Amino acid sequence: MRELIRLVSSAGTGHFYTTDKNKRTKPEKIEIKKYDPVVRQHVIYKEAKIK
């Protein structure tokens, strides 16, 4: 059961990525380091629900 999620930048720029994850095997929230083009550096992105 894969669900769409949104990865929101912790830098506060409003930039986000969308992806999906398997809620059955990974029930915890995702935190991953990705590139934020607004601040032009790698920052931590945290999982949020798609509205």
Swiss-Prot record:
PROSITE patterns: RIBOSOMAL_L33. InterPro entries: Ribosomal_bL33 (IPR001705), Ribosomal_bL33_CS (IPR018264), Ribosomal_bL33_sf (IPR038584), Ribosomal_zn-bd (IPR011332). GO terms for molecular function: structural constituent of ribosome; tRNA binding. Keywords: Ribonucleoprotein, Ribosomal protein, RNA-binding, tRNA-binding. Pfam families: Ribosomal_L33. One of its GO terms (cellular component) is cytosolic large ribosomal subunit. One of its GO terms (biological process) is translation. It comes from the Bacteria. NCBIfam families: PRK00595.1, rpmG_bact. Surface exposed on the 50S subunit. Part of the 50S ribosomal subunit. Cross-links to the P and E site tRNAs. Belongs to the bacterial ribosomal protein bL33 family. This is Large ribosomal subunit protein bL33. It comes from Pseudomonas aeruginosa (strain ATCC 15692 / DSM 22644 / CIP 104116 / JCM 14847 / LMG 12228 / 1C / PRS 101 / PAO1).
